Amino acid sequence: MQTETRSHPRFNHVALTVPGDLLDARGRDEILRFHGEVFGWTEMPTLTRDRELLVLRAWSHEQFVFLAASDSPLRGDGSEHFGLSVATRGELDAMWERAEKLRGADPRVELTERKTDDFKVLQLHSFYVRFLLPIRIEVQCYEWAPGFDDQRMR
């Protein structure tokens, strides 16, 4: 008899509306260059439609950022974001350094300083970055104290 394995649902994509002009050849190239260099994302080229659609593959075909053109695109006030979790502080620092290097070449890159929030059992390292998209991306690394982890906190 086969036992059923249960897993939690997980987020698999973020969909955002953007101005159609951002999805022209130049805009797509800029979006792909930045997000590719900082996060390692790639284009799903079979889905790309000029001035209509760009899908950024985020490490697997089941994780992606879906950018669709709209006459009324999303406009954030600065607090809207989605989060990425990395396994190590080194990964977080490397992403921040790549974003910082690109900010030096392009002032449109918005990047916060890295910070650490101390929750005693958890050191939460993070930064925010945004380039051309209507919302920011928060990169986080959870550094648990000995004897603690995300499972123990349930």
Residue ranges and their predicted role:
Residues 3-13, 21, 54-57, 69:
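Conserved N-terminal glycine/acidic-rich loop preference
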Residues 20-22, 62, 88-90, 135, ...:
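Residues that cap or initiate secondary-structure elements
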Residues 1-24, 74-100, 102-154:
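Vicinal oxygen chelate
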Residues 16-63:
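Core segments of cupin and vicinal oxygen chelate
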Residues 44, 48-87, 91, 152-154:
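A short, hydrophobic/aromatic-rich structural module that often spans a beta strand
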Residues 37-40, 97-101:
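Short, intrinsically disordered, mixed-charge
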